[in-house]
Regions:
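Alpha-helical protein-protein interaction modules
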Residues: 3-7, 12-15, 20-28, 34-37, ...
Length: 213
């Protein structure tokens, strides 16, 4: 999992993305039966925002090895960003069933909570986001997701508390305003998903006390 995360990070940060893409393609060509090679290619494609291609690459990973647990959570993320919110939760639940003690399980809880939040299932979102907070109490984004969910559920004081924690825990000032958050993150998925963020996550943050500017 660390290797794949490293590939994803480098793909986002490097100025030589074409080289990484080429190397990932060469790895698949050299070892077409290697789940790891396909996983590396999928992570690069995801970092490029080529989510449909990334999903196909993740599918190849699971075709080769159904027990490659990181692929389930990563394909769920790719599907969510591509607008397939309904497909996200079963995939992450499968990852949790296969590896409940995974050190990144808190991120998986958060992803399920976020998917519920985007579909306006606020009560279920809160359940999963509270689990995520318990698993990773210092994760700023989880606190922000929970702030939004609490606010949408009418729990404004708890929402304000979580938003304050998100601001304290963040390594930058992204939670000072909606404009700053949107600028720092940059890409919020396909138009369908962006509309869901606006109707749920951003709306909740406004109710929690986050200003526009």
């Amino acid at each position: 999992m660390c290797l794949m995360t490293g590939i994803d990070s480098r793909a986002r940060e490097t100025s030589s993305l074409d080289i990484i893409t080429h190397v990932a393609g060469q790895a698949v060509a050299a070892s077409p039966r290697s789940a790891v090679a396909h996983m590396g290619q999928a992570m690069v494609l995801r970092a490029q925002g080529r989510f449909e291609e990334a999903i196909r690459a993740y599918d190849a990973v699971l075709t080769l090895n159904r027990n490659f647990v990181p692929a389930y959570a990563n394909i769920a993320y790719a599907k969510l960003t591509a607008g397939s919110t309904e497909d996200t939760i079963p995939l992450v639940e499968q990852a949790i069933r296969a590896s409940a003690r995974d050190p990144t399980v808190g991120n998986w809880y958060d992803l399920i909570g976020e998917a519920h939040l985007l579909q306006s299932r606020t009560d279920e979102a809160i359940i999963w986001l509270e689990r995520a907070r318990s698993a990773i109490p210092t994760h700023a984004a989880i606190r922000a997701h929970l702030a939004s969910a609490y606010a949408l559920d009418g729990e404004t004081q708890r929402a304000a508390t979580e938003l304050t924690e998100a601001r304290k825990l963040s390594s930058n000032d992204r939670y000072t305003s909606l404009a700053r958050l949107q600028a720092v993150v940059g890409y919020w998925g396909v138009p369908k998903l962006r509309a869901l963020f606006e109707a749920t996550y951003f709306a909740g943050l406004r109710k929690a006390g986050m200003p526009e500017e």
